[in-house]
Structure formats: structure tokens, C-alpha cells
């Protein structure tokens, strides 16, 4: 037996054993939830925190559907909050007044809850699912957050790590695969199923890591053969970073082809951004925008050579993308894709004209345009057609109008980006900022106040995004999840340190692509 055959057989054995353990755990999950409702919720929570919930979707659906009819234990904050969070994450509306039982006669949360650290963490996690106007959840976040921060001074090291991570990375606003490593370390087995879950998660993680590495090879090959890095030397050459967006948004391993395909339009968002922000003259940018709006290959005749190269590559990529979607899903998305690219370039051009004039727009006007220039709409429109679910005239018409599930994610990206003054990769060029526009507009306002305003607006956009989780719409659950994951990825992409580096992003890439989880 040669080495290759032995390796193949070993991997095959691992896969078979992994599949058997998964089936066992599905049975365990059903049985646990049947015998003890709270324990079933705890197990679902662990499955999600380990990033392997895509293996248990049917079981989770069935259990949470039954949980809707269960009256929460009135005196157990952890159970009430956990059930609230899991159901809302799954699209079930649970009223915020379930937490009124934990208030005193004055209508404020009981101070005695400060002794229940586990319950407070669950309350803080639940409060992240709030929507506009839900004052009880706003109060719950402030109350639990304050007491948890206070507790850090007297808890042991292990619990400090858990509490601090909850405050810094609440589950609903974090990427589960990235946070799974922390859960491996901090979670302690108090039942028979957690160790088996961890074992399955480790195998799953290593298998998915190999899949991602193969996708990077495919993406890098496409990018190299495209040749734009040589032709457009002023532009960013970061195919790995572009792929990370796709990897974060589309977490189901079965979506391998979709991740590779999605990275292609993402790369063009960055390239075109650099043309507008770094290299192009205003006159040339106007011509390029007109060409994209016309969407005719003959429209490039009057463009400079580097723009001809970029437009031709964009044109070919988009047509090829449309053909693949049509062959696989029976719908030609070309018209929607053309609209998204034209809208992006129009928004880029608006910004170029602003900065060429030396005048800052009103903050509201800046943000309205910035939602489009973020590129999120382009990415999510392509993603919708790649997923291929619920493609109807109604859903496509709504998609073309930039619905809230897109615009809120885009606003979060734009505002997060604007919180930092650093430019990606120390690039020169035009650079606007909501903070700068707000300061210009509000005389006497300090930069700290402007930043606080921006942070509050990000929180408000998350509430709008949460509302989309709970509102009927024609989009499939896979698209909603991908949109949420995009919003969750944003802090990693835009949290610069003092050296204008992205330490969180580098850590994410290292964990997801290069580090093997020991078995």
C-alpha cells in the first residue's frame, strides 16, 4: 500500500466516523430536548457556538418550533433569556416583556440579579436581538452590561475570560467559526454530550479548513490568469482578503462553488474603488461611469487604456456569472447585476465630485450615498442569485430596490469604516468620513461626540437588521444568514490598530485557514 492510498483510506475512515458521530448527536439532541427543555436549548446554543449548526438544521427547527409553546420558567433568567435569543435568531417573534418578571415594583431590573452571572450573560446576549423601539431590551443591555463589567474585578480568571468575551463579542454579532476556538477552551463539560460535540466540531473544523484552502487555490488561479494585478499596478492585489469576505458570509461547506464565484465580483468592487479613489481623473471617471451605465463594449472607445482593461474584464466576468446562474437556476440575473454595478459607479462618482470640489456634504446625504458606495449592494445581489433560492419576479424587484436587509448591512460597513481614520494599506487618495461630515455640520461638537453618534447609529442599524429577521420577506433564510454574516465580519475588516494594521482580521485568517485543531 503506497502512502497516497493509505492517506486516502485514513481520510475516508475519518469521514465515516465523523458521519456516524453526527447521526448519534442528532439523536442525542432530540432526546435531550424531549426530556429537558432547558438542556435542549443549552445543547443548541453549544452547537451554534461551535459553528456546526448547519449539520443540525432539521433537529434545531423542530425543537425551536416546540419551544414556542413552552412558557418560560418565571424565575430562571438564563432560561428565559436563552429561549428568547434562540427563538428570535430563528425568526420567531418573542415579545420583550418576557423580561418584566425580573423587574421590581419600580419597573427597574432587580439588583439581586447581579449575583446571577450566568443569567446576566444570557440577558446581555438576548438584548443584542432588539429592534427599534424596544426599550426593555435597551435597558436590559445597559443593566446586564454594567453589572458584568463590575463583576470582572472579583471573579476568578476563568470566569473573567468568559464574561469579558461575552461583553466584547456577543454571539449574535460575532462570527461563530471565529469564536468557536474560545468556546473550546472556556466551556466545561457538565453533561455527557458536550465532549462529543467538541470532538465532532474539531473534525468538522479541520475538514472545512482543507476545503477553504482548496478554494483559495482556485480563486488565486483565476486572479492570476485574469492578469489585472499586472495591468493595474496602482490597485490592491489582495485575493486572499477578498476571499475572506465570501468565506465569512457563506459558512455552509456545501457552498464551495458559490464562495469562489462570489469572490470575483468582490474583487472588482475593490478594483473599481481604487480607480475612483486613487488613480482616475474626474473627467476619466465620468467617462467610465457612463460606460458602466450603458453596459456596451463599444462604450470603452474613449476610455484610457487602464479603464478599458478594467471595464472589459468586468463586462466579461458579469456575463459569465449570469450564464452560470441561468444554467443552474433558470433565471438570467444580468439586468439586476448591471443595475448594481451602475449604482456603485454612480455613487463613487458622486464622492469623487464632492472631494474634487473640496466641500463636504451633509452627514445624512453622505451616508445615503455611502450605503451604495460601500459595495455591499453589489455583493449581496450577486450572492442572492448564487444561492438560487426563491428567485421570483417579486423577490428580484425588491432586491433591485435595495431592501433594508441590504441597506442596513451597508450602513454598518460604511459607519464602521468611517470610525477609523486609517486608509486600507496606507493608500493615498480621496477619503470621506461620516465623522468628518458630522463635525463640519455641528459646530462645537467634539470628535468624541461625533464618534459616539456614529457608534449609536451602528447600533440602530443592527436593530433594523434584527427586524428583518422577524419580518416576512421573499428572501430565503440562507440569504438572511449571509447578510447577517457580512455585518458580523465588518469589525474584523475595519478595526485598525495604531500601525494601520488589522490584527483581528489576521487572527481570523490564521485560525480559519492555517491552524489545525488538535484531535
From Swiss-Prot:
It comes from Fragaria ananassa. The lineage of its organism: Eukaryota, Viridiplantae, Streptophyta, Embryophyta, Tracheophyta. Mg(2+) 1 binds at residues 273, 277. Its cofactor is Mg(2+); Mn(2+). Mg(2+) 2 binds at residues 273, 277. This is (3S,6E)-nerolidol synthase 1. It is an enzyme of class 4 (lyase). The keyword Nucleus does not apply. It catalyses: (2E,6E)-farnesyl diphosphate + H2O = (3S,6E)-nerolidol + diphosphate. Pfam families: Terpene_synth (PF01397), Terpene_synth_C (PF03936). The keyword Manganese applies.
Amino acid at each position: 500500500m503506497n502512502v497516497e492510498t493509505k492517506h486516502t483510506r485514513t481520510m475516508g475512515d475519518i469521514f465515516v466516523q465523523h458521519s456516524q458521530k453526527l447521526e448519534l448527536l442528532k439523536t442525542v439532541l432530540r432526546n435531550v430536548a424531549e426530556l429537558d427543555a432547558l438542556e435542549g436549548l443549552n445543547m443548541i446554543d453549544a452547537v451554534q457556538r461551535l459553528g456546526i449548526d448547519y449539520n443540525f438544521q432539521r433537529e434545531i427547527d423542530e425543537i425551536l418550533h416546540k419551544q414556542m409553546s413552552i412558557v418560560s420558567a418565571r424565575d430562571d433568567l438564563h432560561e428565559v433569556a436563552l429561549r428568547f435569543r434562540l427563538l428570535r435568531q430563528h425568526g420567531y417573534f418573542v415579545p420583550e416583556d418576557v423580561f418584566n418578571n425580573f423587574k421590581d415594583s419600580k419597573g427597574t431590573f432587580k439588583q439581586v440579579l447581579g449575583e446571577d452571572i450566568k443569567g446576566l450573560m444570557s440577558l446581555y446576549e438576548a438584548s443584542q436581538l432588539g429592534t427599534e423601539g424596544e426599550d426593555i431590551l435597551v435597558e436590559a443591555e445597559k443593566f446586564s452590561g454594567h453589572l458584568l463589567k463590575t463583576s470582572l474585578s472579583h471573579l476568578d480568571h476563568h470566569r473573567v475570560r468568559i464574561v469579558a468575551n461575552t461583553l466584547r463579542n456577543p454571539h449574535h454579532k460575532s462570527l461563530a467559526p471565529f469564536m468557536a476556538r474560545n468556546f473550546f477552551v472556556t466551556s466545561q463539560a457538565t453533561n455527557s454530550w458536550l465532549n462529543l460535540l467538541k470532538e465532532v466540531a474539531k473534525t468538522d473544523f479541520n475538514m472545512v479548513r482543507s476545503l477553504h484552502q482548496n478554494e483559495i487555490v482556485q480563486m488565486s488561479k483565476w486572479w492570476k490568469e485574469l492578469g489585472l494585478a499586472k495591468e493595474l499596478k496602482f490597485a490592491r492585489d489582495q485575493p486572499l482578503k477578498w476571499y475572506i469576505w465570501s468565506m465569512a458570509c457563506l459558512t455552509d461547506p456545501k457552498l464551495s462553488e458559490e464562495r469562489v464565484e462570489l469572490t470575483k465580483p468582490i474583487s472588482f468592487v475593490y478594483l473599481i474603488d481604487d480607480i475612483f479613489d486613487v488613480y482616475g481623473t474626474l473627467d476619466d471617471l465620468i467617462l467610465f461611469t457612463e460606460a458602466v451605465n450603458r453596459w456596451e463594449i463599444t462604450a470603452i472607445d474613449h476610455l484610457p487604456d487602464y479603464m478599458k482593461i478594467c471595464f472589459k474584464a468586468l463586462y466579461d466576468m458579469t456575463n459569465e456569472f449570469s450564464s452560470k446562474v441561468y444554467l443552474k437556476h433558470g433565471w438570467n440575473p444580468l439586468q439586476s447585476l448591471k443595475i448594481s454595478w451602475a449604482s456603485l459607479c454612480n455613487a463613487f462618482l458622486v464622492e469623487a465630485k464632492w472631494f474634487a470640489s473640496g466641500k463636504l456634504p451633509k452627514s445624512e446625504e453622505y451616508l445615503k450615498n455611502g450605503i451604495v458606495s460601500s459595495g455591499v449592494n453589489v455583493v449581496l445581489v450577486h450572492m442572492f442569485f448564487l444561492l438560487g433560492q426563491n428567485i421570483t419576479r417579486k423577490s428580484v424587484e425588491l432586491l433591485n430596490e435595495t431592501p433594508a436587509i441590504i441597506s442596513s448591512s451597508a450602513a454598518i460597513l460604511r459607519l464602521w469604516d468611517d470610525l477609523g481614520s486609517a486608509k486600507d494599506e496606507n493608500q493615498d487618495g480621496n477619503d470621506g468620513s461620516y465623522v468628518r461630515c458630522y463635525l463640519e455640520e455641528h459646530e462645537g461638537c467634539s470628535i468624541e461626540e461625533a464618534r459616539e453618534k456614529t457608534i449609536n447609529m451602528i447600533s440602530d442599524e443592527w436593530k433594523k437588521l434584527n427586524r428583518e429577521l422577524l419580518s416576512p420577506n421573499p428572501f430565503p433564510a440562507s440569504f438572511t444568514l449571509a447578510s447577517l454574516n457580512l455585518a458580523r465580519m465588518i469589525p474584523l475588516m475595519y478595526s485598525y490598530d495604531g500601525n494601520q494594521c488589522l490584527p483581528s482580521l489576521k487572527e481570523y485568517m490564521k485560525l480559519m485557514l492555517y491552524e489545525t485543531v488538535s484531535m
